[in-house]
């Protein structure tokens, strides 16, 4: 596994400054982000690897077959990327309603727990998901539409408690954590909410991107 993922190349390849997909023959933004941008509030997505071949198989084994021994490995890979950008305050993308009850665990929360307890990152668990729809079953257009109101800030005492270590204020620089970036609509929705709440810069890190 250590030799399969070459973390030395993280952030070194030419990528789209918006969605993070690798660029081959252009600079700055990919064609999709130039012609039909989704990521407006998001200050760039950094996916570590492409969601292809064995990467797809590993994700299936981790998420669907619950092989949780991959969690510390994936957390280490995220750490390798995050330490190069200097992002220190992480916001996990929340699961759909009922997922934890059905599966018994949340993969993104587990990643963030490793990043918090093993590598010293601060984790702000302040986003909630309002729907139980599975995004993977939707088309691109449906995904973009469904995420507009799918997320929100946690409210009341939960938010107050989460922000207490930060003197009650939302940090200006935040980094979203998710497993796969497909259309970018989920990350964009979450980033927009965080900026409305006062964040100045919201980057996103994902394990994989669908390209």
Give the label of every model feature segment.
Residues 1-211:
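Glycine-rich phosphate/pyrophosphate-handling loop used in enzymes and phosphotransfer proteins
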């Amino acid at each position: 596994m250590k030799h399969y993922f070459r973390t030395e190349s993280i952030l070194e390849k030419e990528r789209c400054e918006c969605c993070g997909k690798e660029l081959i023959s252009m600079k700055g933004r990919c064609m999709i982000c130039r012609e039909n941008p989704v990521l407006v509030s998001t200050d760039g997505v950094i996916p570590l690897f492409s969601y292809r071949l064995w990467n797809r198989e590993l994700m299936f084994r981790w998420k669907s077959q619950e092989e949780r021994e991959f969690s510390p490995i994936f957390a280490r890979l995220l750490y390798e990327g995050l330490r190069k950008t200097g992002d220190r305050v992480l916001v996990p993308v929340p699961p759909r309603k009922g997922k934890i009850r059905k599966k018994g665990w949340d993969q993104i929360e587990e990643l963030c727990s490793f990043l918090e307890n093993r590598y010293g990152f601060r984790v702000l668990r302040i986003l909630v998901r309002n729907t139980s729809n599975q995004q993977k079953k939707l088309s691109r257009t449906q995904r973009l539409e469904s995420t507009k109101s799918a997320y929100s800030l946690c409210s009341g005492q939960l938010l107050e408690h989460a922000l207490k270590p930060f003197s009650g204020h939302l940090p200006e620089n935040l980094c979203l954590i998710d497993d796969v970036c497909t259309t970018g609509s989920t990350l964009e929705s979450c980033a927009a909410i965080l900026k409305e709440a006062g964040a100045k810069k919201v980057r996103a890190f994902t394990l994989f991107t669908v390209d």
